[in-house]
C-alpha cells in the first residue's frame, strides 16, 4: 500500500463551497472571453486567418491548388502574388 501524499481527495475538493465559489465565476468568464475573442474578429487578426468573406475575392475565384510537383515553387509564387 502506498503512503499518503498529503493532498486532498478529489471528492473532498469538488464538494467544498470554496471550489464552487471560485469555479462559478471563472468557468463562465472563460466562456464569455472566448466568445468575445471569436465574435469580435480578434481571433482572425491574431492568428492571421482570413475572415469567411475573404477566402475568395473578385480577382481570385479559383482554389489555390498545386498541380505540378516540380513547378510547385513557381505556382506558390503565383498564388502569393494574387493576394
Swiss-Prot record:
The chain crosses the membrane at residues 21-35. One of its GO terms (biological process) is photosynthetic electron transport chain. It is a single-pass membrane protein. It holds the Pfam family Cytochrom_B559. This b-type cytochrome is tightly associated with the reaction center of photosystem II (PSII). PSII is a light-driven water:plastoquinone oxidoreductase that uses light energy to abstract electrons from H(2)O, generating O(2) and a proton gradient subsequently used for ATP formation. It consists of a core antenna complex that captures photons, and an electron transfer chain that converts photonic excitation into a charge separation. One of its GO terms (cellular component) is chloroplast thylakoid membrane. With its partner (PsbF) binds heme. PSII binds additional chlorophylls, carotenoids and specific lipids. It is found in: Plastid, Chloroplast thylakoid membrane. Heterodimer of an alpha subunit and a beta subunit. PSII is composed of 1 copy each of membrane proteins PsbA, PsbB, PsbC, PsbD, PsbE, PsbF, PsbH, PsbI, PsbJ, PsbK, PsbL, PsbM, PsbT, PsbX, PsbY, PsbZ, Psb30/Ycf12, at least 3 peripheral proteins of the oxygen-evolving complex and a large number of cofactors. It forms dimeric complexes. This is Cytochrome b559 subunit alpha. HAMAP family: PSII_PsbE. It comes from the Eukaryota. Its cofactor is heme b. The keyword Nucleotide-binding does not apply. Belongs to the PsbE/PsbF family. The keyword Chloroplast applies. One of its GO terms (molecular function) is iron ion binding. Keywords: Chloroplast, Electron transport, Heme, Iron, Membrane, Metal-binding, Photosynthesis, Photosystem II, Plastid, Thylakoid, Transmembrane, Transmembrane helix, Transport. Heme binds at residue 23.
Amino acid at each position: 500500500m502506498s503512503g499518503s501524499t498529503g493532498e486532498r481527495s478529489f471528492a473532498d475538493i469538488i464538494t467544498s463551497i470554496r471550489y464552487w465559489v471560485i469555479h462559478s465565476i471563472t468557468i463562465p468568464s472563460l466562456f464569455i472571453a472566448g466568445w468575445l475573442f471569436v465574435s469580435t474578429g480578434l481571433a482572425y487578426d491574431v492568428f492571421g486567418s482570413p475572415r469567411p468573406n475573404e477566402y475568395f475575392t473578385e480577382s481570385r475565384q479559383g482554389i489555390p491548388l498545386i498541380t505540378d510537383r516540380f513547378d510547385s515553387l513557381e505556382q506558390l509564387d503565383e498564388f502569393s502574388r494574387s493576394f
